[in-house]
Amino acid sequence: MLAMSSTQIAAFTPDQAAKLTTSQIAALNKQQLQALKPEALAQMSTTQIASLSATQVANLKMEQADALTEPQVLALGNKVVNLYVSPLILDLNRDGKFSVSVDNGVKFDIKSSGSLLKTAWVNSTDGLLVRDLNGNGLIDSGSELFGDHTKLPNGKLAVNGFAALSSLDGNRDGIINSKDTQWKDLKIWIDRNSDGHTDPGELASLADMGVTSLKLNVKSSTAVENGNKIGLVSSYTMVDGSTGVLADVWFRTKSVNAPEVKTVGTLDHITHTDLPPGS
């Protein structure tokens, strides 16, 4: 542990924080890390930021995470899942695009905390895979999406959208379809006006949309789209036998009052040729 108190670390200027070694950063405990000013974190190099452990990233306060630049976020690699939320999205128009940036997104209780967050969001022509758990005709929070805030039968939260969906695979055949008991409960939410609210006509059953199955065999993706990561991809099948991409998209989130952060990075388009074998 760095031999300094949290009070001393809180007094660091951005220039002083930029001089910390990677070993010193890796040694910061939770209290020390959270004492760093957001502007001090933002001044660190991508090498310094990459030295943070997954646990340290998870311990960042919201205002600290908000201050990270896009190059810093990308430098975190797979540890960024601790800064993101991961709903499943069906690429309904099959254009290889899924989402808009957090600054062009919505306010939604995506972490099921009872509080709204600014979050990246699904494109208006694609669909979120959802369940109306409380039967009110609305999708109220991240608990009704399929992602890392989906509660599993054992009471724990899923690690990603496909892990959440896998819990419904009653016959363990790697496919979610009409043979699975909860198939009838699955719906697609197309937020056509991109407002984060479930408006009349935006919720439809999989059958109404012509979807006959969802495959659980996934492969990892390194694509970045509007500051969001396309983490895992699989496929869905339509009644005519055609297929589309089902993706676990890791949305960037920010506190409601956070300033706009410009995003960088390009999307390596996900196409039908990117699907796992057997899709």
Positions of the model-derived regions?
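General marker for long, soluble alpha-helical cores
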Residues: 1-87, 105, 109-118, 158, ...
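Calcium-binding acidic motifs and repeat modules
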Residues: 80-279
